[in-house]
Amino acid sequence: MIQKNWQELIKPNKVEFTSSGRTKATLVAEPLERGFGLTLGNALRRVLLSSLRGAAVTAVQIDGVLHEFSSIPGVREDVTDIVLNIKEIAIKMDGDDAKRMVVRKQGPGVVTAGDIQTVGDIEILNPEHVICTLDEGAEIRMEFTVNNGKGYVPAERNRAEDAPIGLIPVDSLYSPVKKVSYKVENTREGQVLDYDKLSMSIETDGSITGEDAVAFAARILQDQLGVFVNFDEPQKEAEEEAVTELAFNPALLKKVDELELSVRSANCLKNDNIVYIGDLIQKTEAEMLRTPNFGRKSLNEIKEVLASMGLHLGMEVPAWPPENIEDLAKRYEDQY
């Protein structure tokens, strides 16, 4: 069955996001097949930084200024520095059409992003960000062009051929994701100790949460990779797709080596040919204690694990073991 190429790979049963304020989030996903932590971490990082859409200033027009190499009387920063500061304004904007924003201020004082007058569908996310500083008697008026896009667009590409004199193009940093880092560690699943654990830190400009950013990046990868799938997935027979009505708890189909038992306890169960939880719970305490090298400490450990699942030793299970137990275990694995 070709489906086994992807169906039998382990998938994370733990995907947790922890937010730290408006702009920072941490993702932990485990377990992953060996090597998949690096594969997924690197792919997600690249897409997060390059391919998500956001808003940015594309051009600015400053009253009395003809080009970016000018200076403005009474303004401490020259126009080049002002343009660099404008690049760092964090913006959230709905819609795809270009919008205008205006700021007008008299000195003395500092001009910040919070001084900008915006329309209803534009939000300044870092209003404390400094644009320039005015001396006594100085005045400045700037009009910004804002657009939506993705990635990084240099000023030259924002320069329109029919642009009026004095319209200064700006490098546009559209990506709402500012920083992404990740690390891969070993993690345990059952008795397997070398699965991957992916930890990722995401910092955004506040226009999107880290969790949503990862979801969008994953969807982009899913869409891009889908074009390489050159086959239709084989259809199972109708009777195979129908879920068999079980006479017992599906959790009994879970293998005991997936329980987080000590090595000693796990080896004792293996030596006694106890493969599934359904095999285990039918044993009595006395039967377990007669198992070679199995002591009271191992017994208490197993009783505690079973109790956490609502089970205990000495249970009667009708119709156990079922026919095709391995197929049933795979079919019901999402239910335990």
UniProtKB/Swiss-Prot annotation:
Residues 248-336 are annotated as: Alpha C-terminal domain (alpha-CTD). CDD domains: RNAP_alpha_NTD. InterPro entries: DNA-dir_RNA_pol_insert (IPR011262), DNA-dir_RNA_pol_RpoA/D/Rpb3 (IPR011263), DNA-dir_RpoA (IPR011773), RBP11-like (IPR036603), RNAP_asu_C (IPR011260), RNApol_insert_sf (IPR036643). It catalyses: RNA(n) + a ribonucleoside 5'-triphosphate = RNA(n+1) + diphosphate. DNA-dependent RNA polymerase catalyzes the transcription of DNA into RNA using the four ribonucleoside triphosphates as substrates. Its EC number is 2.7.7.6. It is an enzyme of class 2 (transferase). It comes from Rhizobium rhizogenes (strain K84 / ATCC BAA-868) (Agrobacterium radiobacter). One of its GO terms (molecular function) is DNA binding. Residues 1-232 are annotated as: Alpha N-terminal domain (alpha-NTD). Belongs to the RNA polymerase alpha chain family. This is DNA-directed RNA polymerase subunit alpha. Keywords: DNA-directed RNA polymerase, Nucleotidyltransferase, Transcription, Transferase. GO terms for cellular component: cytoplasm; DNA-directed RNA polymerase complex.
